[in-house]
Amino acid sequence: MSPTAFEPVAHTRIPSLGIDFAEYLHPPTGARHFHLACDDPNNAFMVAFPTLPQDSSGVAHILEHTTLCGSERYPVRDPFFMMLRRSLNTYMNAFTSTDTTAYPFATQNRKDFDNLLGVYLDAVFFPCLDPLDFAQEGWRLELAEDGAALEYHGVVYNEMKGAMSAPVAQLWQHLHTALFPDTVYRHNSGGDPLAIPQLSYAALRDFHTRHYHPSNAVFMTYGSFAAAEHQARIEQLALARFKERRAPLISTVQTPFVAPRRLEVGYEADAGEPRNTHIVWAWVHGATANVDELIELHLLGGLLLEHGASPVRHYFETTPLADAPSELSGIDDSAAQLVFMCGVEGSERAHAEALEDGLLEILARVARDGLPRDVVEAALDRLEMAQRDIGGDGYPFGLQLMGRVLAAAMQRRDARALLDLDPVLARLRAALDDPGYVPDLVRRILLDNPHRVRLVMYPEDGKAAHEHELERARLAQMRAEMDAGAIAEVAAASAALAERQAREDDPDVLPRVTLTDVPPPADLLTARERGSATVPCASYECAANGVFRARLACRLPALTPAETAALPLFCEYLTELGCDAEDYLAVQARRAAAGSFQAWALVRPGPADDGALAAWLLLGGKGLARKREAVLATLAEMLAGVRFDEPARLAELLQQSCAEAEQSITERGHQLAILTAAARLTPTAALDALWDGPAAIRALQAATADANEAAVAQLFATFESIRGKLLAAPRELALIGDAATLDGLAPDLAAFAPSAGGVGAEFVIAPPPADEVNAWLASSQVNFCAKAYRAVHESDADE
């Protein structure tokens, strides 16, 4: 292998993650490469650029789309989606955030990695950027069907119309505009639909030239492939063609406020509906790339907001002045500066002052009295578990690690420190010896920090109609000023785009893997059986990085239609209610010290028969290896001990679930349409629609509106009936961890044993009614449509 111009900058072993961290610089161009070496075969790659918007035209977002519409070596219209079918990738994507655009992928196959690397590098450095692709992905003018009016079209234009219909998206954008009024973060990087048509094709090309230069590029790789091999390919495929080194682009920070600010804005909603107002508070404190400030803020967020026993979350959950805590509650580390956010939804404008007084009183109490040391240590343990956990819920671990360091890398700060958290966690544990540490955090970050905004977002009837009228008037004026030649140009451009979209590209222009490139299937983990006849138990030894997992699977028995419909709420609330003699507050605090826990239902069709269901209720828990006994004890009590006698708590949970579901409608519009369209095709599709579709939201609204004493008691009775059936159901236990964690572990299997009663009927799904509606109305600027087709069974032979 020929040597490259990359030079080493730093190298560190990070034991807590089992990786070797190395940083390299490419002096001829200024490009940087971070390599995370380990023996993980799921190798990952990312190239990222600072994309600093100067307006809300969505230029960075539209450029992200347009780069993936063909490049110099791969001049096909849609190489990204074509590669999805020609690749063994475990992940492929591209995304634009507030100040960065990144292109990540992951795969376990060497040839596939090289194929994807070639396509990605050519796309970002040498894209075609055809004007027709800009028209398709960004925006364009088209004549309406009657030819009498103009309309805006475009993928990103329509995408952002839908995205900005979501109240939470509007809330987030208004908040960041208010917090960072003098920086790029005041702009909508995805694109404001009112501003997107102001972007020109020339501005798009200029933005690419300025931002997508190797001097700005950050390359990241992870896994078992060598750094030198990556560098040789990166230099050969891209960097060798650039001779100029520029000063890198870095986002600026906001000058701190000298006094808190307040803002009220309207959003499209029925002003006649009560309690439709969002009220959120946000503070700016510290730099995202400063590991001490980052972890301190996450610690404070965990202490104040993480669960129902956390003081600020408890206040927002129980106040009669609002329905639920805001979805924006938590820490935002997506920009150069950190943001602490909390608030409520389902309130009134008139309640803002009273809610703020209550919030500041809670913070003042914590600043005065502190919090119990065991509560703070539990929050630190959760931070340590987040550092060590390699699970990822299907998201490749290498890309998770890249996400942790991306902000620091783009800011030209110490990326390694954001991976090696053990030193900062040790400093925090030592700081707990000072009883004034947590009170000082609250005062320094929140109470004494004037860089604060209170945002009230209230319902405003007709706001969307007014914006639509502004757009219609603008288009009408443009149409009136057009002569016949200009109109013909619009029609010709539309025809040219339609012709390009209909053209068949040659897929063989793109690389692919063949069966000869696919290695034999990897060996699955071998289970060590250690259970009994009543509770089969299997342990799986793996490199778990100091995290222990346990999962209890209970076979779903036959349920009534009412019980089947209520099962998602049963699962969601199983970890939110009291247990045995403890109320929910005590349980939340105790379990937070042990780890994290969840419950969910899993129903899958048979490989050859849609009606042959594999149906399970799964209880999962994970924690640090030293807390494995507490994880198992909690898992054993979750089903048997849960209390269905806290009506006020259930009413709170219903309100929160309903508020969350209503706010998610426009965000989940495509998914809701797909679920509804597919509901009558298979039994499991019908169940998906019942549990997650529009009908589920309607049922939740009805349950919340009717959450009186009798209705709550009836729901608890349904939960109790489900629990009784599950307690008698067959079950299996699985334990996952490294050898040191599993050796000597002897779970009390009797605590997991089913109750007497034997095996009842199996779970079945009732068919949906024949007159089921398939159209739903929602407050959105765009429509979501879907058509579903029945596919072959999994066991059908390939052709």
Model region roles, listed by residue range:
Residues 33-36, 206-209, 261-270, 537-540, ...:
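Short, surface-exposed beta-strand/loop micro-motifs that present aromatic residues
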Residues 2-4, 52, 66, 70-73, ...:
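Charge-rich, well-structured scaffold segments of protease-associated domains
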Residues 28-40, 272-280, 288-291, 333-335, ...:
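Active-site-adjacent "gating/activation" loops or surface patches in catalytic cores
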Residues 37-83, 292-304, 545-590, 633-635, ...:
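Active/ligand-binding-proximal structured segments within catalytic/core domains
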Residues 3-19, 90-94, 757-766, 773-775:
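Short secondary-structure junctions
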Residues 314, 324-327, 532-550, 554-566, ...:
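Non-catalytic regulatory/linker segments of enzymes
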Residues 240-300, 769-791:
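Loop-rich catalytic cores of soluble enzymes, especially ATP-dependent carboxylate-amine ligases
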Residues 1-40, 500-548:
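N- or domain-start disorder-to-order transition segments that initiate the globular core
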